């Protein structure tokens, strides 16, 4: 056994001596690992070109992307294109709309530029604008600033000259700047001077220079006068063209001021002192009637404040003085001392009531004012209540007479409901007279014995005007009496 192993080991020893040639006793044997020599494989020694490994399934789907470094981008030039470019197909909305035409001259944002025709204005402070659209494109230059035609004024007082116009230019902050057109100088006197001063007052709220030399009242009172004159000019249908007519308008509007101040205003404009005819003085006397304690000038009456045909709510500027009628006081001087003391006490109590009424802030004439509130009852008449037949018609009649107008109140006193009992005058019209003549109210004989009131009521009854067209119409004082009885009877049943 030992000999066999020895022979087997000697065979491997002879193979090592062979140098690894593989030609020993065992030709099919491999040389040992230590005798192998490895060399790197060079691609140049290969006779067959190598092929890349087969791509995976995911890599076969997209095509191979070229390297970015090999791409060269050049700008597209229209000259290199042989086929003319066509616009992209329009959207569904663009296919429905017709093609928009080019904007011609005279259009602004696709809309015809309107032309404003300025027509001569014969009525003071009543300028109207007529705007129409041109039939075709017109050449218009776009204005650089917004201009407003403010007012028209008459240059002369002869009535034959054409009115002139001026514009007020506003900047981006809506502030009035220098007018574009040069204004003519102010006339020294006459109707044209008064109208020019009223136009300037609407812009500056300042009275004309030189007026203080003719009047004695303070500046606040002068501003109040011109506010009343401006409101009177806007209310009248035909403005005065002669100095005499303008003097009557000024005297009627400023009737409550002192006579020296009224004469000073008339002298400032060169107006004559007006004389009132006998017919006018019969119904509308220049002097305050007997029994009037105070005179008040109201702000424009709101139509919603007229509750029925004989009552409404009025507001009076707190800057307007409450004028005590000195002539009534003087008439009482000749009487005995008891009546004089009674009149003084009544006037003092009424003045306290006038001054202690509620106040409210209001806008008038472009400024904020503080006004007193007064509940007014028309003296001497009684109109149907709203719940009665012909009550709404009577209320509408009073609305047409005084709504949006300034009225003059002749205060006689207060009734049991703390309302101020007054005669009402508006634009030279006695309101109670109009209500009675047209049949919108009854003469309240229990509280007023004036004979002209009975005369005006008889005229309406004979002509069957207003409420007199109805037969057996219930009187308002009887209606109120029956209503009070029904209320007392209902209260007794409840108890």
Curated annotation (Swiss-Prot):
<feature type="lipid moiety-binding region" description="S-palmitoyl cysteine">
    <location>
        <position position="11"/>
    </location>
</feature>
<dbReference type="InterPro" id="IPR035437">
    <property type="entry name" value="SNase_OB-fold_sf"/>
</dbReference>
<feature type="domain" description="TNase-like">
    <location>
        <begin position="297"/>
        <end position="470"/>
    </location>
</feature>
<dbReference type="GO" id="GO:0004519">
    <property type="term" value="F:endonuclease activity"/>
</dbReference>
<feature type="active site">
    <location>
        <position position="385"/>
    </location>
</feature>
<keyword id="KW-0449">Lipoprotein</keyword>
<keyword id="KW-0564">Palmitate</keyword>
<keyword id="KW-0479">Metal-binding</keyword>
<keyword id="KW-0378">Hydrolase</keyword>
<feature type="compositionally biased region" description="Pro residues">
    <location>
        <begin position="50"/>
        <end position="66"/>
    </location>
</feature>
<feature type="lipid moiety-binding region" description="N-myristoyl glycine">
    <location>
        <position position="2"/>
    </location>
</feature>
<dbReference type="GO" id="GO:0046872">
    <property type="term" value="F:metal ion binding"/>
</dbReference>
<keyword id="KW-1003">Cell membrane</keyword>
<feature type="binding site">
    <location>
        <position position="310"/>
    </location>
    <ligand>
        <name>Ca(2+)</name>
    </ligand>
</feature>
<keyword id="KW-0106">Calcium</keyword>
<protein>
    <recommendedName>
        <fullName>Probable staphylococcal-like nuclease CAN4</fullName>
        <ecNumber>3.1.31.-</ecNumber>
    </recommendedName>
</protein>
<feature type="active site">
    <location>
        <position position="377"/>
    </location>
</feature>
<dbReference type="GO" id="GO:0005886">
    <property type="term" value="C:plasma membrane"/>
</dbReference>
<feature type="region of interest" description="Disordered">
    <location>
        <begin position="81"/>
        <end position="101"/>
    </location>
</feature>
<keyword id="KW-0472">Membrane</keyword>
<comment type="function">
    <text>Enzyme that catalyzes the hydrolysis of both DNA and RNA at the 5' position of the phosphodiester bond.</text>
</comment>
<keyword id="KW-0540">Nuclease</keyword>
<feature type="active site">
    <location>
        <position position="419"/>
    </location>
</feature>
<dbReference type="InterPro" id="IPR016071">
    <property type="entry name" value="Staphylococal_nuclease_OB-fold"/>
</dbReference>
<feature type="region of interest" description="Disordered">
    <location>
        <begin position="45"/>
        <end position="68"/>
    </location>
</feature>
<dbReference type="Pfam" id="PF00565">
    <property type="entry name" value="SNase"/>
</dbReference>
<keyword id="KW-0519">Myristate</keyword>
<feature type="binding site">
    <location>
        <position position="382"/>
    </location>
    <ligand>
        <name>Ca(2+)</name>
    </ligand>
</feature>
<comment type="similarity">
    <text>Belongs to the thermonuclease family.</text>
</comment>
<keyword id="KW-0255">Endonuclease</keyword>
């Amino acid at each position: 056994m030992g000999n066999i192993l020895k022979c087997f080991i000697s065979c491997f020893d002879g193979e090592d001596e062979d140098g690894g040639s593989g030609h020993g006793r065992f030709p099919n044997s491999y040389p040992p690992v230590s005798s192998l020599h490895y060399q790197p494989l060079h691609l140049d020694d290969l006779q067959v070109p190598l092929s890349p490994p087969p791509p995976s399934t995911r890599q076969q789907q997209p095509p191979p992307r070229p390297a970015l470094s090999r791409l060269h981008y050049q700008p597209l030039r229209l000259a290199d294109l042989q086929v003319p470019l066509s616009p992209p197909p329009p959207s569904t909305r663009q296919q429905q709309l017709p093609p928009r035409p080019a904007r011609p001259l005279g259009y602004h944002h696709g809309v015809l530029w309107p032309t404003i025709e300025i027509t001569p204005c014969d009525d003071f402070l009543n300028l109207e604008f007529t705007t129409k659209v041109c039939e075709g494109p017109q050449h218009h230059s776009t204005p650089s600033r917004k201009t407003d035609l403010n007012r028209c004024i008459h240059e002369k007082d002869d009535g034959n000259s054409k009115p002139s116009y001026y514009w007020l230019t506003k900047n981006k902050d809506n502030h009035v700047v220098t007018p574009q057109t040069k204004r003519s100088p102010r006339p020294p006197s006459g109707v044209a001077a008064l109208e020019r001063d009223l136009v300037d007052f609407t812009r500056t709220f300042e009275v004309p220079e030189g007026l203080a030399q003719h009047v004695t009242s303070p500046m606040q009172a002068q501003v109040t006068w011109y506010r009343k004159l401006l409101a009177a000019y806007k209310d009248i249908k035909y403005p005065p063209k002669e100095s005499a007519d303008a003097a009557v308008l000024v005297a009627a509007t400023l009737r409550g001021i002192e006579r020296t101040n009224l004469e000073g205003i008339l002298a400032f404009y060169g107006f004559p002192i007006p004389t009132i005819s006998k017919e006018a003085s019969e119904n509308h006397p220049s002097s305050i009637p007997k029994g009037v304690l105070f005179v008040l000038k109201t702000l424009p009456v709101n139509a919603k404040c007229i509750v029925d045909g004989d009552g409404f709510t009025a507001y009076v500027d707190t800057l307007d003085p409450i004028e005590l009628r000195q002539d009534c006081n003087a008439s009482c001087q000749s009487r005995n001392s008891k009546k004089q003391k009674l009149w003084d006490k009544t006037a003092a109590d009424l003045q306290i009531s006038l001054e202690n009424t509620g106040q409210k802030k209001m806008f008038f004439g472009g400024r904020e004012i503080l006004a007193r509130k007064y509940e007014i009852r028309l003296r001497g008449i009684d109109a149907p209540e709203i719940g009665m037949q012909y009550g709404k018609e009577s209320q509408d009649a009073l609305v047409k007479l005084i709504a949006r107008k300034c009225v003059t109140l002749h205060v006689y006193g207060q009734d049991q409901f703390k309302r101020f009992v007054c005669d009402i005058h508006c634009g030279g019209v006695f309101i109670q007279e109009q209500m009675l003549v047209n049949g919108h109210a009854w003469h309240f004989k229990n509280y007023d014995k004036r004979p002209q009131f009975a005369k005006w009521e008889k005229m309406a009854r004979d002509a069957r005007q207003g409420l007199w067209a109805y037969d057996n119409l219930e009187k308002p004082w009887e209606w109120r009496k029956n209503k009070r009885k029904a209320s007392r009877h209902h209260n007794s049943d409840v108890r």
